């Protein structure tokens, strides 16, 4: 009986894992996003100056590493002491990529800026998360307080930030990278423990 049950348990766990890889949840509230993740790391871009930067640009957010890339280069935007990350060309996207540390959650404040790097109100931004599957979300009328976050059941490959083709530049501020809340793995670990119990019983 237990011998025949073990393959069924393994199959159920594998099916659950396969199904979870396609699940990306969108958050538009930072507090809700942070409640769904663990060990967040932040990058506020305040070390950037208003100038052109080569692409890709290596960055860190807490213990996590990542790159920001754009075809025509990146641009440090912002005013005063509050600096942001943008692109050199308005139609170019920012691609956040090559995450380290098992990053499966990515969020931040996303809005539009002008040719001088100043804030443009009510821009429309399009963000796409890719973890093997893709999910696209449009921020309409984005402001400096427009938060968007993706939480995946799998590690993220890329997150892309672009405009809808308007005469403004895609801009990011205060991005946060994280891993899943430990409870995300609870059912899987419990299932694996059950497989271990089945194995021990079969050999006893």
Spans of model-derived segments:
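Short, charged juxtamembrane terminal tails flanking transmembrane helices
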Residues: 201-204
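Surface-exposed, well-ordered secondary-structure segments
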Residues: 23-178
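A short, hydrophobic C-terminal helix/tail in secreted or cell-surface proteins
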Residues: 181-199
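Absolute protein N-terminus
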Residues: 1, 22-23
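N-terminal signal peptide c-region/cleavage motif recognized by signal peptidases
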Residues: 17-19
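Bacterial N-terminal signal peptides that target proteins for export
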Residues: 1-8
